[in-house]
Amino acid sequence: MKTKICIPIMGQDEKEVLNQAEKVLQMQPDLIEWRADYIEKLDTDVIENITAKLKNIIGNVKLVFTFRTADEGGKQSISDEKYSEICCKAAENCDYVDVEIMGHMKIAKNLIAGIKKNGAKVIGSNHHFDNTPSNGEIIDIMKKMEEQGADICKIAVMPEAKEDVERFMDVSSQLKDILNVPIITMSMGELGAVSRICTNITASSVSFAAGVDASAPGQVKADILRKLLKVKKYFLLNYNQERQLYQRHCQKLHLLRKLM
C-alpha cells in the first residue's frame, strides 16, 4: 500500500490561501487540505470563490476541504446549520470534505448525503487532543463513522506515554480488518510522530505533513516524510527499527543545520 501525503494550507485570507497553495504544490503532495476555519468571515460565496481558484492552481492534486471546529482543535465554533451549509458548498469544487461525524451526529446522515450529492467523498474525522481513548472506544468511533456513510475514516489522538503510541498503532493495524473503508490514523505530538511514518503497521492510507506551517502537533516536514516513506519500499521494518530510523534522520538534519 502506498501512503499518500497530504499537506495543509491555512491562510487567513484568500491571498494567503492561494499563495500557500502555490508553495505547497512545489512539494508534490498527493492531496492538499484547505483548513477553511482559519478564515474569520467565511460564507458560501467565499468558499465557492476560493475552492474554484484552488482547483485551478493545484490541477490534478486532490483537494480536501476541512472546517475544523473549536471542539476538535480548530479555530472557530459555528452552528450545525452553517457547518452543513459550508461543507455542502465546498463539495461542489472539492474531491473530499472532512466531516466531524461524532460531533455532528444529529445532522450527519443528511450532511453526508448532501456532500455526496454535490460530488465529493467524505472523510469522517474525530480528534482527541488530550488523550488516547481505549482500544474499544477507538474501534467503536471508527465503526460509527463508517455506518454514517464515511468513505474514509480518520482518527487522531494525543499520547501521554510511549505505551499509548504503541497501543494506538496496534489497534490501528486491527482496524483495516474491521472496517470496509480506508483509514487515516495518527498519534499526535513529538511522541506520536513515528505513527505518521510507520504506515505499513498502522495501515493509514494518508499521512499529513507540514508544508508552510504545521496544522497539528507532530507533523513531519513534507520532504522528510517523503524520504522516510520511500525507504519502506526497500526494507520491511518493525516498529522499533522504524522509530530508530526516524530519530537518526532527524539527528542528522539537526547536525547539518548547525553547520550551515
Regions found by a protein language model. Name each.
Residues 2-6, 30-33, 60-64, 95-98, ...:
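Structural preference for beta-strand elements that scaffold enzyme active sites
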Residues 2-18, 69-80, 125-136, 238-240:
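Active-site mouth loops of central-metabolism enzymes
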Residues 10, 31-41, 94-106, 123-132, ...:
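Catalytic beta/alpha-barrel core
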Residues 12-25, 78-89, 134-144, 194:
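Short, acidic/polar
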Residues 39-54, 101-117, 133-136, 160-175:
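Active-site-adjacent beta->alpha loops and helix N-cap segments on the catalytic face
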Residues 63-106:
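Glycine/small-residue-rich loop that forms an oxyanion/phosphate-binding "nest" at active or ligand-binding sites
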Residues 164, 172-239:
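C-terminal alpha-helical cap/extension of soluble enzyme domains
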Residues 205, 231-260:
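N-terminal ligand-binding/catalytic initiation module
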